[in-house]
């Protein structure tokens, strides 16, 4: 393998702003903001707006959209549009 062609892969704390959950993982992303983790070490912090800890799909709080009514309403509105001349 060639040396010095791979990006710096290091530990980072991802902070979910929606839920307050913090996740320590590895990434190539950088940040100037730092925080101390439970192991006593200081790591860069990257704020994310949403993660698996707060996304409705993963938390089970998702809404199911009723698309059948919307399709019927669309078809009723445009049923005569673009017909043969």
From Swiss-Prot:
Annotated source species: Micrococcus luteus (strain ATCC 4698 / DSM 20030 / JCM 1464 / CCM 169 / CCUG 5858 / IAM 1056 / NBRC 3333 / NCIMB 9278 / NCTC 2665 / VKM Ac-2230) (Micrococcus lysodeikticus)
Gene encoding the protein: rpmE2
Listed GO biological process terms: translation
Pfam family, one: Ribosomal_L31
GO MF assignments: structural constituent of ribosome
GO CC, alphabetical: ribonucleoprotein complex; ribosome
Keyword Ribonucleoprotein: yes
Family, per entry: Belongs to the bacterial ribosomal protein bL31 family. Type B subfamily.
Gene3D superfamilies linked: Ribosomal protein L31 (4.10.830.30)
Subunit structure as annotated in this protein's UniProt entry: Part of the 50S ribosomal subunit.
Keyword terms, alphabetized: Ribonucleoprotein, Ribosomal protein
HAMAP family tied to this protein: Ribosomal_bL31_2 (MF_00502)
Keyword Lipid metabolism: no
Protein name per Swiss-Prot or TrEMBL: Large ribosomal subunit protein bL31B
């Amino acid at each position: 393998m060639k040396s010095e062609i791979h990006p710096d892969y290091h530990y980072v704390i991802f902070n979910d702003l929606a839920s307050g959950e913090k996740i320590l993982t590895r990434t190539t992303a950088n940040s100037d903001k730092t925080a101390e983790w439970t192991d006593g070490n200081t790591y860069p912090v990257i704020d994310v707006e949403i993660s698996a800890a707060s996304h409705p799909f993963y938390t089970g709080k998702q809404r199911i959209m009723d698309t059948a009514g919307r399709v019927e309403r669309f078809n009723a509105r445009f049923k005569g549009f673009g017909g043969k001349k």
